[in-house]
Amino acid sequence: MQEKIIILDFGSQTTQLIGRRVRELDTYCEIVPYNKFPKEDPTIKGVILSGSPFSVYDKDAFKVDLSEIRGKYPILGICYGAQFMAYTNNGKVEPAGTREYGRAHLTSFCKDNVLFKGVRENTQVWMSHGDTITAIPDNFKKIASTDKVDIAAYQVEGEKVWGVQFHPEVFHSEDGTQILRNFVVDVCGCKQDWSPASFIESTVAELKAQLGDDKVVLGLSGGVDSSVAAVLLNRAIGKNLTCIFVDHGMLRKNEFKNVMNDYECLGLNVIGVDASEKFFAELAGVTEPERKRKIIGKGFIDVFDVEAHKIKDVKWLAQGTIYPDCIESLSITGTVIKSHHNVGGLPEKMHLKLCEPLRLLFKDEVRRVGRELGMPEHLITRHPFPGPGLAVRILGDITREKVRILQDADDIYIQGLRDWGLYDQVWQAGVILLPVQSVGVMGDERTYERAVALRAVTSTDAMTADWAHLPYEFLGKISNDIINKVKGVNRVTYDISSKPPATIEWE
């Protein structure tokens, strides 16, 4: 059985980042609500307590009885997790004079403590807290300080229990990964045997046992998640998998043909459906973004349902749901707050059982599995693309002419990113067709044509994103190419908004 680290989530914005850092150590972990610790699980090797937006003094602060965990498993408390353990053992936690947020340095630490093995002197750590541990119980030992925080880390004497006031999971903590490695590998004894190859081997075996000779249908989007799910299922059940790829008319230029060719080269049984007439008719005159999304979502369900019913004896619906979707579908108390299904409503409407072979993976792990499966790199590294496609990059109503303009402009931009070696440096990129026209001059004639905005962002998880600082020379060439080659466009702008406050997509 796969050994694991359990991360108890107290509501921190960086809880998923803890999970990703542990997985990067080739160690399997699971994130569970703070009050849902899985008892009697022999595969658990250690426990990490996350941070929290609460103070330990808040009436609604998340609290849990750790008596059944402490002494049985090694524990690492991060920020609120460290404060909570100190506070519940008669230590003192007090509001800081000012909230400490940002870089700090460990001015002193116990070099002989296993948690700090290999950590450099004066190493930078990331702080984000309003409360500070000001006193610890007699059996707690201070093991690190910063210039502003006296008790930056502690260990319970004689126990494998640590607390750190800083966030080792955050990129800005320079030796954060080393600290987590020390806990996960040296303290908990994890074997670091979680790999794409081991995941594929175990998942294929599980899928064969789960699905048997049943038939499965899967909706493909052209994105990495559904594509990797399809290849994995194909390895497990072969001809019993049927994939459906619906073209709603708002894909990127030549995308339907190119993606279908990719899928056929991968040996997948794929049904391609051109439903563009239906979608354009239903979207005619619609300008409100959310209504556009709902029309496309419902239309996809209708088309998919019709095609799936043409396949006899289908028992399962497969989806490319990944681990962050599953985590986000639960509130901190474990109650459902939104469906994580990639295609909302399909399982209920079609009365099919649900199969989600990637539900344990983060996005970067999905790509690693795709490479292990031998999938082409251009498919694995594709940027995220919204389900409604270019419909949410056309501000205002949707027409075939607007889609044509946007497809041509987007094709020039994306190909340019590839040609300049910039594509893999950005998280997501695309062109937005603006609902305005501007005056221009071409030759000796005055023009009054459309404006487009280029968008490119850098990110690690899409929760936050910064605008990509692309070279001016590149932007100038792309602007010139679009204006000269795309009929109907005479102005190109570049969006330099970050998330937050803006979102990655405009609609």
Swiss-Prot record:
Residues 4-193 form the Glutamine amidotransferase type-1 domain. Disulfide bonds: none annotated. It comes from the Bacteria. PROSITE patterns: GATASE_TYPE_1, GMPS_ATP_PPASE. The keyword Zinc does not apply. Its EC number is 6.3.5.2. The active site is at C79 (nucleophile), H167, E169. ATP binds at S221, G222, G223, V224, D225, S226, S227. The keyword Zinc does not apply. Keywords: ATP-binding, Glutamine amidotransferase, GMP biosynthesis, Ligase, Nucleotide-binding, Purine biosynthesis. GO terms for molecular function: ATP binding; GMP synthase activity. It is an enzyme of class 6 (ligase). Pathway: Purine metabolism; GMP biosynthesis; GMP from XMP (L-Gln route): step 1/1. One of its GO terms (biological process) is GMP biosynthetic process. It catalyses: XMP + L-glutamine + ATP + H2O = GMP + L-glutamate + AMP + diphosphate + 2 H(+). Residues 194-382 form the GMPS ATP-PPase domain. GO terms for cellular component: cytosol. NCBIfam families: guaA_Cterm, guaA_Nterm, PRK00074.1. Catalyzes the synthesis of GMP from XMP. Homodimer. HAMAP family: GMP_synthase. This is GMP synthase [glutamine-hydrolyzing] 1. It comes from Bacteroides thetaiotaomicron (strain ATCC 29148 / DSM 2079 / JCM 5827 / CCUG 10774 / NCTC 10582 / VPI-5482 / E50). The lineage of its organism: Bacteria, Pseudomonadati, Bacteroidota, Bacteroidia, Bacteroidales. The gene is guaA1.
